[in-house]
Amino acid sequence: MFFVERFILKKLLSWKNSPYRKPLILKGVRQVGKTWILKEFGRRYYENTAYFNFDENEEYKQFFETTKDVDRILQNLMLASGQKIVPEKTLIIFDEVQDCPKVINSMKYFCENAPQYHVACAGSLLGIALAKPSSFPVGKVNFMQIDPMTFNEFLLANGDENLAQYLEQVDSLEPIPDAFFNPLYEKLKMYYVTGGMPESVLMWTEARDISAMQEALSGIIGAYERDFAKHPHLSEFPKISMIWKSIPSQLAKENKKFIYKVVKEGARAREYEDALQWLVDARLVHKIYRSSAPGLPIAAYDDLSAFKIYLVDVGLLRRLAQLAPTAFGEGNRLFTEFKGALSENFVLQTLITQFEVMPRYWSQNNPPYEVDFLIQRENDIFPVEVKSETNTSSKSMKKFKELFPDKVKLRIRFSLDNLKLDDDVLNIPLFMADQADQLIGLALEKMEH
């Protein structure tokens, strides 16, 4: 894994320094960089790191099965591995813990009886393990989520510190000068091609090797597809696989609502619900419910029968949809191809990292209107639209405002247009999606004055 500045390091440092620190469980999909980030964190901020991988050394599991005594567990681990562990000075990493309920459960004893040890656990498919609350250490751990690299992290990895820095320091709603605007669009197209999975980014930023990058993405998709077989009921395996493969087709529709019969002719919700939930728990997909109105709490207005499904990463979506990377050189094709789904997926990814509450969407039939996303920011709900062309006016956003005039302070549009606040519509260039929260704050301030 190559060196790259990942913003989660700041969060990890806050965890280390917190007086309320508990053992950490780092969640994230396979190959998103969990192990690398923990080792890098240990290297930077601790005297040493003690690393234990329960996939490679299954015999370590035994130490957790025979005792609840933390000192004894650590003594055994040190003797078996030859690594030293010093309270406060060592970062202890337990990796691949998803199949080790006893290890996960031992975090309770680390928390209660041995807070002087800094422990971090990681594992892929942890969402699945944690969905089964058999004997989980409730309230005894801190959770953190690591997502694919953001566009800003991609810029840093690509050697474009100047562009990343420019985006970080935007503090007004003035239009972005062409000297930044044009290169940022070109870089964003490249990000749509690579996505944010570190191995894929590495093949592009270090080697500029498109075919190696394609192979890296295929390898990651292959690893996920092998994971589907880990569902406890083998009969679910083909269903998970069919749902996964149907996602590009689901997003290529004008109306992106998830429809089971796109998965398989005649498929019914009840036959496929568990398989879909497995993908959601694994966080390989994001499930966005339809909201009937922009009320608070937003979850109270969920229509559980209508939802859209997006992929964990825009590059994986492009690869799964078999969209060739050559589209990068063809004008706006990456933005407009299959109904702008790559842009929607990209915007959703950044909204999830910036806002605590999972976004929703809004729609109504006859005549059909749809607002791509609703986001909750503090006690406000904002409609969000993603447009993959320039100069777009939107009937749905107008309709939404007509229906809920008191609820809509600001409407947000992500598009290929420049940054501007036009009455109550904030247009954010797609390449500034990572700055959405900050830009919304600036817009609200400006409107108040």
Listing of model-derived features with the role each one plays in the protein:
Residues 56-87:
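Short glycine-rich substrate-engagement loop in P-loop NTPases that contacts/grips substrate
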Residues 93, 118-124, 145:
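Structural recognition of the conserved hydrophobic beta-strand(s) that form the central parallel beta-sheet
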Residues 156-349, 353, 359-366:
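Interdomain hinge/linker elements that couple catalytic modules in large macromolecular machines
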Residues 34:
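Conserved lysine of the Walker
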Residues 45-60:
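Conserved catalytic segments around the Walker B and adjacent sensor/switch elements
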Residues 127-143, 155-160:
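Short regulatory helix/loop adjacent to the ATP-binding pocket of P-loop NTPases
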Residues 85-102:
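Conserved P-loop NTPase "ATPase switch" module shared by AAA+ and STAND
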Residues 2, 16-24, 31, 40-44, ...:
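A cross-kingdom feature that marks ATP-driven nucleic-acid transaction machinery
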